[in-house]
Amino acid sequence: MDQLSMKKMAAQAALQYVKPDSIIGVGSGSTVNCFIEVLGTIKETIKGAVAASKASEELLLRQGIEVFSANDVSGLDIYVDGADEINPQKMMIKGGGAALTREKIVAALAKKFICIVDSSKQVDVLGSTFALPIEVIPMARSQVARKLVALGGSPEYRENVVTDNGNVILDVYNFKIMNPIEMEKELNNVAGVVTNGIFALRSADIVIVGTPEGTKIIG
């Protein structure tokens, strides 16, 4: 079974957590695109969605799903998003699509975080296969990069990428993240960092994994 089929399988399984008349938090990325597609099949049963990126907002509108601002809601029942890596404790690295800050904002509104992935995203230690994205204020890029080197990382500027918030991304290689919660806090305290792609303080509640053998739910 190919990767896209596994992503579609996980996306389809996430529909079981969608409650009638609710507003759904929606992340961004290729697996979320699959979820938006299947969400369109039940659009008459929900009020709408809050999107974590402009790209997801456009896809939702194309499906005929009303999009609300995060400022329009006081809370969300569920937030559905993918991950670039996820460990057994349901902590993640996210931000391959540069939407990490808005993803954290929308995730923080939700009672339940549902992560949908294919099996290639499962790792024992975060940072094993994927660089850690960090959103940085442009004027602080070099300063933050020096700090990341001092912490043992190898930052690379993601060229020609500007986030929806007008900032830049540094991708940090060679971080083996043994204590994700502490690392998330430490990096967020660096002057000039908007946020980093570790989702440990707000980890997933339910993980739906598309595998060659079928869908696996970790709750």
UniProtKB/Swiss-Prot annotation:
Substrate binds at residues 28-31, 81-84, 94-97, 121. Pathway: Carbohydrate degradation; pentose phosphate pathway; D-ribose 5-phosphate from D-ribulose 5-phosphate (non-oxidative stage): step 1/1. SUPFAM superfamilies: D-ribose-5-phosphate isomerase (RpiA), lid domain, NagB/RpiA/CoA transferase-like. This is Ribose-5-phosphate isomerase A. It is an enzyme of class 5 (isomerase). The keyword Isomerase applies. Homodimer. PANTHER family: RIBOSE-5-PHOSPHATE ISOMERASE. Keywords: Isomerase. Its EC number is 5.3.1.6. Belongs to the ribose 5-phosphate isomerase family. The active site is at 103 (proton acceptor). It catalyses: aldehydo-D-ribose 5-phosphate = D-ribulose 5-phosphate. GO terms for molecular function: ribose-5-phosphate isomerase activity. GO terms for cellular component: cytosol. Catalyzes the reversible conversion of ribose-5-phosphate to ribulose 5-phosphate. One of its GO terms (biological process) is pentose-phosphate shunt, non-oxidative branch.
